[in-house]
Amino acid sequence: MGLIVYSDQVRELMERTDEMVTAADIAPILGMKAETIIKKAKEKRWDRGVCNYIVSGTRVKFFRVDFLRKGGWIQ
């Protein structure tokens, strides 16, 4: 079962955060806890073709091009 965040939601988030998204920022959209997002990112459970990410402390950086090219984010 996949969870999709549509590009308009992501675009709005990116405009607010200038490409740097905290796990806390994206957690409400994904319906997940920030801690779970960080854990999954660190364990590299996400498909690299869908979302590239870098985890640094409690911040997760998502690359704008990947979000918008795919039309959203798929878990």
Predicted regions, residues:
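Polar low-complexity intrinsically disordered regions enriched in Ser/Thr and small residues
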Residues: 5, 52, 60, 74-75
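Short, Lys/Arg-enriched anionic-surface-contact patches
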Residues: 1-12, 58
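A broad, structural micro-motif
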Residues: 21, 62-63
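Short, flexible coil/linker elements and helix-boundary hinge sites characteristic
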Residues: 18, 31, 45, 71-72
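Polyanion-binding surface elements
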Residues: 9-40
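A short, Lys/Arg-enriched interface patch at domain edges and termini
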Residues: 64-75
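Major-groove DNA-recognition helix of helix-turn-helix-type DNA-binding domains
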Residues: 29-61
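Short linear motifs in intrinsically disordered/low-complexity regions
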Residues: 9, 19-20, 48, 53, ...
